[in-house]
């Protein structure tokens, strides 16, 4: 009769002993969990970057004497330099051809070409924004607001 009672207890889950296979599996699971513990090191491998070198803008001021100087200007623009071009020493037709050539290169490189004064131009690459607010303000009001009220 005790066999019947023990079978009934084991069937209902009230048996007093554990299966050896279950004990071994639980130990293996615990060992696996312990083996995956994170390893923390006190040494940090941080990368130090100088933030001031990334935004260094270079400016080139040129006064071309011949049309062939346009290639030098376009190379500087391609290297992301801001170029100020003074064409006052060139003939009008040569200056116009030079500005047309530089303007085409500027368009191809997504840059910007603006006239600062008569015969003086600024060419900026795509990563530089040139504001023209002062020029429009000066043309409307003049340098000083001397108008009497």
From Swiss-Prot:
Q: GO biological process annotations for this chain's record? A: division septum assembly; FtsZ-dependent cytokinesis
| Record bears the keyword Cell division | yes
Gene3D superfamilies given for it?
A: SepF-like protein
**Compartment(s):** Cytoplasm
Q: Which GO terms describe its cellular component?
A: cytoplasm
Q: Which InterPro entries match?
A: Cell_div_SepF, Cell_div_SepF/SepF-rel, SepF-like_sf
Query: Which keywords fit this entry according to its UniProt record?
Result: Cell cycle, Cell division, Cytoplasm, Septation
Q: Which family does it belong to?
A: Belongs to the SepF family.
Purpose of the protein: Cell division protein that is part of the divisome complex and is recruited early to the Z-ring. Probably stimulates Z-ring formation, perhaps through the cross-linking of FtsZ protofilaments. Its function overlaps with FtsA.
Task: State how it assembles.
Answer: Homodimer. Interacts with FtsZ.
Name of the protein described by the UniProt record: Cell division protein SepF
Q: Which organism is it from?
A: Clostridium perfringens (strain 13 / Type A)
UniProt lists the gene as sepF
């Amino acid at each position: 009769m005790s066999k019947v009672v023990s079978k009934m207890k084991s069937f209902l889950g009230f048996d007093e002993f554990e299966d050896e296979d279950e004990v071994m599996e639980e130990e293996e699971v615990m060992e696996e969990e312990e083996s995956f513990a994170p390893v923390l090191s006190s040494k940090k491998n941080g990368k130090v970057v100088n933030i001031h070198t990334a935004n260094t803008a270079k400016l080139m001021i040129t006064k071309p004497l011949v049309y062939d100087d346009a290639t030098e200007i376009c190379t500087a623009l391609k290297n992301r330099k801001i170029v100020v071009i003074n064409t006052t020493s060139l003939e009008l037709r040569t200056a116009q051809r030079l500005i047309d050539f530089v303007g085409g290169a500027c368009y191809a490189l997504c840059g910007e070409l603006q006239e600062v004064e008569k015969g003086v131009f600024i060419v900026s690459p795509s990563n530089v924004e040139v504001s023209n607010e002062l020029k429009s303000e000066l043309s409307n009001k003049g340098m000083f607001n001397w108008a009497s009220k």
